[in-house]
Every structure is written in C-alpha cells, then in structure tokens.
Design a protein with these regions (language model features):
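Contiguous beta-strand/loop segments that form the cofactor/metal-binding neighborhood of enzyme cores
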Residues: 185-258, 275, 287-294, 328
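N-terminal Rossmann-like dinucleotide-binding module
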Residues: 1-51
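Conserved SAM-binding strand-loop segment of SAM-dependent methyltransferases
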Residues: 53-60
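C-terminal helix-rich "cap/oligomerization" subdomain common to oxidoreductases
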Residues: 71-73, 220, 287-329
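Short active-site oxyanion
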Residues: 31-35, 70-72, 174, 247
C-alpha cells in the first residue's frame, strides 16, 4: 500500500520528518510526502514547497479532514500533543505522535484508549525505539560478550535554555520531557524488567521547570541505571552498559552513531558501525507502514503499555520534584 503522510505542525522537527519521508520516496518506498498543516496557510505553503509536499492547509482541522491522508505525524510542542493527536483520531486518522507522547500519564491512557476504541493506529515517535541499533545492542547484551550485565549509565544534554519551549511551563518545559525521556528509554530498552525503586534529584530553572536532573532506577532483577539530562550544558550523550567481562559504549543515545565493546582492561576489542540512514526518522515511518499493512493498532517497537509506563515514571519524578504544569492545577 502507498502510505500518504501528513505532518501536523511546521517547525524544526517537522522538517526532519519531512526529509525522512521524502528520502523514503526517493529510494522507492511506497510512502508519499502528501500534506502539511500549520496555523497559517502561508507557513504551510512555504513548508510544502520547500519539503516537496503536495498539499498545504492553513488549519489543523482542514489537514485531518483530508480523506486521502493515511498517517498524521504530530509535530507540535508536547503541551499540545494530546489535543492534536485526539483531533486526528476523531477524524479517523492513524497517528504517529512525537515524544514526549503527552503531558502526563492520564492523557496517555485516555489517548491510547480512544485510539483502541476507534480501531486506529497510534504510536509514540521516540526514534531510538525504532532504529536497528536497538536490536544490535540487545543482541550484544544477550550474546554474553560483556558477561553478566549489572548496570548502565546514560546522559543527554544540550545548552538550549534560550529555546522557549524548554523553559516555559505552559509548554510543559524542562529537561525531563524533552531530553530525559531518551536516557529513560535507553535504560528501559536495555533492561525491560519492572522498576523496583526510583531515586532522583533536579535543579530548577528560574521558571520552576527542571533544568537538569539525575535519576537512578533499580530494577527487580537487581540491575541499576544511572541517568542524567540537562538543558544547560552539552554532554557527551554516551550510553555505557556494564558487565562482569567488559562494557558496551553507545555513542549518542539520542541517535546512535557507533557501538564499541571493551574488555576488562578497557581495551576496545570491537567497533560496530550502525547502518547508514536518511536521518533516523525513517524507521518510525516504516514501522507505521508495516503496522497499517498488518492491521496492527500499535507498533511493537513502542506498545501503548510501554508509553504509559514511561509517562507514569516521569509523572512520579515531577511529583517528587514539586513540578506541576499550570494545566494540571
């Protein structure tokens, strides 16, 4: 089947998705860069012309009303994800929703239940979940090359306090939902067991959102993950998985570039490149295409239950830090 993709929103992340969809079409995949919707028609038209999309709409309602749209990618700030994803679902559209999936777990539960009721595909666009590097890392853990795995660490930080969505509580700002979600997902992909204990700390920005945070997860099997995210500094973005015979380094947990294996003497014994990609977003699109072709209502790479589990964890972290968004009061 040809899958006609529509993008709801015309910001930077929408451009990244547009490039991926266009790249898929150029390499012969049955995917069409079909339509874009923005709050202003002129902006949508400029985006469509620049990115090679066939149609432009000056409202989100018009976009989701187009009967030829097969998949809507929600690319607005995460404070608006619930509203915009639900709008698309109400109009019978399958949805790929950018992370963080929603503002909180309550919204996530409502949205996934609504999609299931409507019989539509809904999945969270947390891109490392869909990348081939995910299975490569899991296969290495299972192979025993680093022995018995006991712990991991992961971090992600960028100096982006100048970006309004990061510091504005009305936009669900803070490092956790925008950046911290990646180390958390890295840990939960590597260690799928139930989390037994959580400890954490955060430093707040002047607007009372979290500027940087440190999270330690202890899993029921005794493994541990130590995680850090920040919107104040550039970090090395490194993921390290530790075993009793060595360790695995993942260069850039946000978009893995290379995987290295080290022995107990800290000597690199193997370097594994990740497959070439358009920009990494294409794997989400292909997963949605496969799901639609097979009649699935969620993607196995990020099932609804896992999205809700991550949102519940982030809710509990914010609660422990005393961070409540204005819309939640």
């Amino acid at each position: 089947m040809k899958m006609r993709v529509a993008i709801l929103g015309a910001g930077n992340i929408a451009r990244s998705m547009a490039a991926a969809v266009r790249g898929l079409q150029e390499r012969g995949e049955d995917v069409e860069p079909y339509a874009v919707g923005a709050r202003e028609l002129s902006r949508a038209e400029a985006f469509a012309k620049e990115q090679g999309f066939a149609k432009a709409y000056g409202s989100y309602e018009e976009l989701v009303s187009d009967p030829d749209v097969d998949l809507v990618y929600v690319a607005t700030p995460h404070s608006m994800h619930y509203e915009h994803a639900k709008l698309a679902l109400e109009h019978g559209k399958n949805v790929l929703c950018e992370k963080a999936f929603t503002m909180n777990a309550e919204q996530a539960r409502d949205l996934t239940a609504f999609a299931e009721e409507k019989g539509l595909l809904l999945t969270e666009a947390i891109w490392p979940r869909y990348m081939p590097s995910r299975q490569m890392i899991l296969d290495l853990i299972d192979s025993g090359v680093i022995g018995k795995v006991t712990s991991l660490s992961a971090n992600l930080g960028y100096p982006i306090t100048h970006v309004e969505r990061m510091t504005n509580p009305d936009l669900c700002g803070g490092a956790l939902l925008d950046l911290g979600v990646y180390p958390i997902n890295f840990a939960c992909m590597a260690f799928p067991e139930k989390i037994k204990e959580v400890s954490s700390a955060c430093v707040k920005w002047e607007t009372e959102v979290d500027a940087q945070n440190s999270i330690t997860l202890t899993f029921e099997d005794g493994r541990m993950a130590v995680l850090y995210s920040s919107m104040m500094v550039q970090s090395d973005r490194l993921g390290v998985i530790n075993g009793d015979r060595g360790y695995i380094e993942v260069q850039n947990i946000n978009n893995p570039e290379e995987i290295r294996i080290f022995d107990l003497s800290r000597a690199c014994i193997r370097t594994i490149p990740v497959p070439e990609q358009i920009n990494g977003y294409e794997y989400e699109v292909l997963a949605c295409k496969e799901a639609l072709e097979k009649g699935w209502k969620e993607c196995p790479q990020m099932p609804h239950a896992e999205t809700i589990r991550i949102m519940e964890l982030m809710d509990s972290l914010r609660k422990s830090w005393g961070i409540i968004y204005p819309m939640e009061k």
